[in-house]
Amino acid sequence: VICYRKYTNNVKTCPDGENVCYTKMWCDGFCTSRGKVVELGCAATCPIRKPGNEVKCCSTNKCNHPPKRKKRRP
């Protein structure tokens, strides 16, 4: 399976045994100014969701699209 791995159109073919694409999002100390931290990648199984985190998993090529960022005000 092919998954996105950064906030660009940067994709990679997952290693053997990793057939799930995931998107993990959470807030850090800069959440109010920068938005949520986003991690994209491949895994053998869907990562476990921790309190305060969002996790989305899928298993088709390029299915973990990077979320759209809000536009900054000038």
Curated annotation (Swiss-Prot):
Keywords: Acetylcholine receptor inhibiting toxin, Disulfide bond, Ion channel impairing toxin, Neurotoxin, Postsynaptic neurotoxin, Secreted, Toxin
Disulfide bonds: 3-21, 14-42, 27-31, 46-57, 58-63
Tissue specificity statement from the Swiss-Prot or TrEMBL entry: Expressed by the venom gland.
Top-level division of the source organism's lineage: Eukaryota
Main location class: secreted
GO cellular component entries: extracellular region
Compartments where found: Secreted
Listed GO MF terms: acetylcholine receptor inhibitor activity; ion channel regulator activity; toxin activity
SUPFAM superfamilies membership: Snake toxin-like
Keyword flag Lipid biosynthesis: no
Keyword DNA-binding: no
Xref: CDD domains: TFP_snake_toxin (cd00206)
Gene3D superfamilies tied to this protein: CD59 (2.10.60.10)
InterPro entries referenced in this protein's UniProt entry, alphabetically: Snake_3FTx, Snake_toxin-like_sf, Snake_toxin_con_site, Toxin_cobra-type
Role description: Binds with high affinity to muscular (alpha-1/CHRNA1) and neuronal (alpha-7/CHRNA7) nicotinic acetylcholine receptor (nAChR) and inhibits acetylcholine from binding to the receptor, thereby impairing neuromuscular and neuronal transmission.
Similarity field: Belongs to the three-finger toxin family. Long-chain subfamily. Type II alpha-neurotoxin sub-subfamily.
Name of protein: Alpha-elapitoxin-Aa2d
